């Protein structure tokens, strides 16, 4: 990039600088790029930047210096001219040749060596430019590219004002511009989640490089920040621009944001949405229970008032029935909303894309049955039918005109199943994340049955009491309503009489003084008897559990019994020893033997032996009873501790053995190197000995040369001078 704000591709072998360019380069790089060709080269060949000269000849150096001086003079003349103002940019634009464009990232990359190739550069991709690009952008001048003459190879690039973006990171620009020389392809980063917490604006530097045809230059389209499905600058081909614009305003704004929003939800958003659905489902269940119980209470009030105070055709009855119908409609809406939340939770938990996957036949049947149960209620208006029954003791038929509300009112008690649902959703075991995690690891399904089991374990008496009293009251009122049209003596139609009938049926007593007349009352008594048998069994189990000793009480009891049995064993053993001594005394030590006393002590001796055996047997039984599951678990813990200690000791032993092995290996290596050391030591001693002999021999030769005979040894040492086992070593 030169001082005029133009960009020169220096350092690339296929791009050359044109000496006729109106925008000269500056510095040493321009001098190296614009060196003239050698004299032998023809003028039509494009100038190539010469490589580094190694040890040039003096004439060549002089020629290069002259050429450089001429180039510097030309550059100074060109630099004295003003820079390209905005009017001149418009003139330069008319002289441009429209070439094939390369759709690139904001960083420049290597362009091919052709006269019709340019590249669009982002204004922030070259930060070292001296041209005021901001003024260029404010002037709204179109992007222009300048090419040299037919013989030139340089490409002067100007920034395009069509792209508007924030200032880029210089370190990012350096890393991206290195791809021009290293051949790397700039790929976009992976799209992050589109949730509200981690929405980030995508950078246009991450767009991949795409090559377009010379006849169809790219068109730059800038997306707004309000676009939910783009978030980044898109470069479209002009042939497909109209299709993208037309489709983006219609289908893109409706379908694409929803799909991307669903796909780009991260785990945190899903967990938060799941927790919100849990809370909404719990509130819907609470509201459904409230409206269901409200309808039951209003139904009971309307039934009792229409029997004694006013008739079914009165305004009070109509108002109460309308209130029941309104509560029923609200209840049905709440149930639909509840199951909608259930389906949404299923979709989130299983990662499904379509909610229809959750709508199995079983779920549809369950929802339909629940809607049918909750939809039953007395219809506003007066509707009657003839009810025929046979009396219990006289067996005479009885015919009466009854209200249809009896058939529609009694099934409303089936709405009480909502209590179990509310108990499940409000249970600590169901709402606590830790308990649910532990249950999932142990393959436990948290449902209503599990919650009822835990309640029966924690407070069995309270659960049975509440269940029995509720069943007693509901069954008594149902029998009273069923029997009121055929009870001429007012026995079972009385509420207290009905409670007595239900109580004796519940306890499976059945005195027979009161019996139902209608099939409705008989059916209620049958269900009451079945539920009473189950409740009685549960009561017996609860009482037996309450009478059972706890673990601490069992341990204390076993300890006390063991202590008493130990004392009895000691007493029985002492009695055996005492009777043995007395028998020995009366038979051996006394002069006159008293046979009566001997038989008496023998009898006591046998009794003491049997007593000792019996106490030992009781002690064995107590020890067997003490070996319960708790003791076995304790023994298991003790054995586990012992095994752990043994493992620790074995690990220590292995470490010691390993250290011994390493030491043995070291000793083995030392022993293996010992012969070499001994050989080296002996060799050194032999050399020292030979040196001493040579020195001694030299001294003796110097003293008596004429007296010593000539030596045949190659080193001039006589064999007699070496010590032998049979000679003296005084010469040493």
Swiss-Prot record:
Pfam families tied to this protein: CaMBD (PF02888), Ion_trans_2 (PF07885), SK_channel (PF03530)
GO cellular component: cell body; cytoplasm; filopodium; neuromuscular junction; neuron projection; neuronal cell body; plasma membrane; Z disc
Compartments, record wording: Cell membrane; Cytoplasm, Myofibril, Sarcomere, Z line
Record keywords, A-Z: Calmodulin-binding, Cell membrane, Coiled coil, Cytoplasm, Ion channel, Ion transport, Membrane, Phosphoprotein, Transmembrane, Transmembrane helix, Transport
Skewed-composition ranges (Basic and acidic residues): 1-11
Listed Polar residues bias regions: 113-133, 241-257
Transmembrane segments: 289-309, 316-336, 367-387, 406-426, 455-475, 524-544
Notes on activation and inhibition: Inhibited by bee venom neurotoxin apamin.
InterPro entries in UniProt: CaM-bd_dom (IPR004178), CaM-bd_dom_sf (IPR036122), K_chnl_Ca-activ_SK (IPR015449), K_chnl_dom (IPR013099)
Biased composition (Low complexity): 60-82, 139-148, 718-732
UniProt-recorded Gene Ontology molecular function terms: calmodulin binding; inward rectifier potassium channel activity; protein-containing complex binding; small conductance calcium-activated potassium channel activity
Intramembrane region list: 495-515
Positions in coiled-coil regions: 643-670
Region (Calmodulin-binding): 562-638
Catalytic function, reaction form: K(+)(in) = K(+)(out)
Main location per the UniProt record: membrane
Modification sites for Phosphoserine: 168
Membrane topology category: Multi-pass membrane protein
Alphabetical GO biological process terms: potassium ion transmembrane transport; potassium ion transport
Region ranges (Disordered): 1-82, 103-162, 241-260, 704-732
Family per record: Belongs to the potassium channel KCNN family. KCa2.3/KCNN3 subfamily.
Subunit structure: Homodimer. Heteromultimer with KCNN2 or KCNN1; this modulates plasma membrane expression and consequently the small conductance calcium-activated potassium channel activity. The complex is composed of 4 channel subunits each of which binds to a calmodulin subunit which regulates the channel activity through calcium-binding. Interacts with CALM1.
Role played: Small conductance calcium-activated potassium channel that mediates the voltage-independent transmembrane transfer of potassium across the cell membrane through a constitutive interaction with calmodulin which binds the intracellular calcium allowing its opening. The current is characterized by a voltage-independent activation, an intracellular calcium concentration increase-dependent activation and a single-channel conductance of 10 picosiemens.
Domain comment quoted from the record: The coiled-coil domaim mediates heteromeic assembly.
Protein name (Swiss-Prot/TrEMBL): Small conductance calcium-activated potassium channel protein 3
Naturally occurring in which organism (per UniProt): Rattus norvegicus (Rat)
